[in-house]
């Protein structure tokens, strides 16, 4: 199992735009064959901070995700919304086992 935690800081005035764009990416991502989970979390103390919790069956599936039309559209759409660069941190999932 391949897990990536993506830390996102959005310009405060673009939060709603980011949520809309990210919903479309989420909806496409959860349909990918290797996707196991794709959660989008918002910090209640700072609504401009988000965490994307992405779980794929393998590293190859996670890499393939970045070539999908929905991901590429999302990446381009949110580029100008970022208050700082996104930080993706890979993790190895232990439990639950696949």
Over which residues does each language-model region extend?
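Short, flexible segments with low predicted structural confidence
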Residues: 1-2, 16-17, 33-35
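Short, well-ordered beta-strand segments in beta-rich or mixed alpha/beta enzyme
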Residues: 2-9, 39-66
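Short phosphate-engaging motifs
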Residues: 14, 48, 70
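An amphipathic, aromatic/His-enriched active-site/gating alpha helix that lines ligand/cofactor pockets
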Residues: 20, 24-36, 55-89
